[in-house]
Amino acid sequence: MEVKDILKTVDHTLLATTATWPEIQTILDDAMAYETASACIPASYVKKAAEYVSGKLAICTVIGFPNGYSTTAAKVFECEDAIQNGADEIDMVINLTDVKNGDFDTVEEEIRQIKAKCQDHILKVIVETCQLTKEELIELCGVVTRSGADFIKTSTGFSTAGATFEDVEVMAKYVGEGVKIKAAGGISSLEDAKTFIALGASRLGTSRIIKIVKNEATKTDSY
């Protein structure tokens, strides 16, 4: 797999709580220059970012982030607001308290409500795999499939661990047809990126891959 093909799977991400507009601009410029799938940024920057890229790049943002335990109504509002401001893709965090209570029906209904507001915009569902048992992850693969969401996503990048090869393998085995996989958190090398893609991920959430590619380009004058 060529580097350009890897870059097409990347949601180039900056979700730091202290992210400044110049830092967001750099993310947007790099994402456009390297033709990544999207730039994933805080919701407060979506409107300004959408105006800045002027249709040249998909803008992704997060809702219910990073803990997921805001109410469904709050998440629905966040979704509507983000789309109104120009977001093309939404990454939502599920309520893990519902998961731990065994209330998967409530998790599914919340995703359905948010997907209804997304309409033709892409919805990715963050399940925070580092906090799940294997059995919970398998159950959530079914929940996300039935909900109509477009992607199941491993991690926020703000919890105890990010994506693992094992979790992506489980997702690839148990998620239904039509649901794609996004691996996110801790992807720090091109080799890891290739492995995640080989295991079934079609999106990668990372802030590091472009830095690596830039370093390689400096050495070889190409990527």
From Swiss-Prot:
Gene3D superfamilies: Aldolase class I. One of its GO terms (molecular function) is deoxyribose-phosphate aldolase activity. Keywords: Cytoplasm, Lyase, Schiff base. The keyword Lyase applies. It catalyses: 2-deoxy-D-ribose 5-phosphate = D-glyceraldehyde 3-phosphate + acetaldehyde. GO terms for biological process: 2-deoxyribose 1-phosphate catabolic process; carbohydrate catabolic process; deoxyribonucleotide catabolic process. It comes from the Bacteria. It is found in: Cytoplasm. CDD domains: DeoC. The active site is at D91 (proton donor/acceptor), K153 (schiff-base intermediate with acetaldehyde), K182 (proton donor/acceptor). The keyword Cytoplasm applies. One of its GO terms (cellular component) is cytoplasm. Catalyzes a reversible aldol reaction between acetaldehyde and D-glyceraldehyde 3-phosphate to generate 2-deoxy-D-ribose 5-phosphate. Belongs to the DeoC/FbaB aldolase family. DeoC type 1 subfamily. PANTHER family: DEOXYRIBOSE-PHOSPHATE ALDOLASE. This is Deoxyribose-phosphate aldolase.
